[in-house]
């Protein structure tokens, strides 16, 4: 597009814009020119042409956009680059991705119907395959996120259940500790009672043995007493035929033996009392 075209339209442009426009339209394309610089050139060209409404939308804009698309298609890495429309890259998620994919599919379908260039057809097919791959990838990611959310919900439920079980176990442990202390105190009390009972039993056995010993020493044998009584009854008096002048006042009789036995029993009691006061 030259200067007289702008004059025919009736729009006034500055000298720098005219120089840039002339350079862009007349300069040959460098094959070593970077793809990003080409895209930037196309975007800059579009911004210069459409930023302030210098030209209405029409065939001229379609021609410029087709030039930019051809520049992008000539690059070997254009298949790996995401689609750019109007200098704006679509990076939305969710439903916006679906809407943009539908719009891009319609646009690509229209372009495939309008063009017969094999390179354009390959590029469109490549873009469609990339778009389908992106759809599948987003679908897998969405399913994975839903699965993760489900797992998180289940883990939260398990966590709450385990926390309740931990609280119950803690309460049971505390009650068991209290019962253990009570049982220990009861065991100590029973031990003291058993010791007291053993002491009482030992004292009772000692007392009973002492009583038996006292009864044994205090009660004289029955056969000796009967023999003494028998002797006293059978021999009431014994007369010694001797000279009484040698033993004056000495008379032996059975009645004089009883006081001697009484003295023996009293001495035994006194001995026992000395041993066990």
Swiss-Prot record:
Subcellular location: Nucleus
Domain of life: Eukaryota
Keywords attached to this entry: DNA-binding, Nucleus, Phosphoprotein, Transcription, Transcription regulation
Composition-biased stretches (Polar residues): 109-118
Region spans: Basic motif: 122-141
BP GO annotations: cellular response to glucose stimulus
SMART domains xrefs: BRLZ (SM00338)
One Pfam family it belongs to: bZIP_1
GO cellular component: nucleus
Motif (Nuclear localization signal): 124-131
Tissue specificity annotation: Expressed in roots, shoots, stems, young leaves, and flowers, mostly in vascular tissues (e.g. phloem).
PTM text: Phosphorylated.
Induction profile: Repressed by glucose.
Domain bZIP: residue ranges: 120-183
Residue list for modification Phosphoserine: 100
Family: Belongs to the bZIP family.
Subunit-structure text: Homodimer. Interacts with BZIP1, BZIP2, BZIP10, BZIP11, BZIP25, BZIP44, BZIP53 and BZIP63.
General function of this protein: Transcription factor.
PANTHER family membership: BASIC LEUCINE ZIPPER 63 (PTHR46408), BASIC LEUCINE ZIPPER 9 (PTHR46408:SF8)
Full protein name: Basic leucine zipper 9
Gene this protein is translated from: BZIP9
């Amino acid at each position: 597009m030259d200067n007289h075209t702008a004059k025919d339209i009736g729009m006034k442009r500055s000298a720098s814009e005219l120089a840039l426009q002339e350079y862009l339209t007349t300069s040959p394309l460098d094959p070593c020119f970077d793809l990003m610089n080409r895209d930037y050139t196309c975007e800059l060209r579009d911004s210069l042409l459409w930023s302030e409404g210098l030209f209405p939308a029409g065939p001229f804009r379609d021609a410029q956009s087709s030039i930019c698309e051809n520049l992008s298609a000539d690059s070997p890495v254009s298949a790996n680059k995401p689609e750019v429309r109007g200098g704006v890259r679509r990076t939305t998620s969710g439903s916006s991705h679906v809407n943009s994919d539908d719009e891009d599919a319609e646009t690509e379908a229209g372009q495939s119907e309008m063009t017969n260039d094999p390179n354009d057809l390959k590029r469109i097919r490549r873009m469609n395959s990339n778009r389908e791959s992106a759809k599948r990838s987003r679908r897998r990611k969405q399913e994975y996120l839903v699965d993760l959310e489900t797992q998180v919900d289940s883990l939260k439920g398990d966590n709450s259940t385990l926390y309740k079980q931990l609280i119950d176990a803690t309460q049971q442990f505390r009650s068991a500790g209290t019962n253990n202390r009570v049982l220990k105190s009861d065991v100590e009390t029973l031990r003291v009672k058993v010791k007291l009972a053993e002491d009482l039993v030992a004292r009772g056995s000692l007392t009973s043995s002492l009583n038996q010993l006292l009864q044994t020493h205090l009660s004289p044998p029955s056969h000796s007493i009967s023999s003494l009584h028998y002797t006293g009854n059978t021999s009431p008096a014994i007369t010694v035929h001797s000279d009484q002048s040698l033993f004056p006042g000495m008379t032996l009789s059975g009645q004089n033996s009883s006081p001697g036995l009484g003295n023996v029993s009293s001495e035994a009691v006194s001995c026992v009392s000395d041993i066990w006061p």
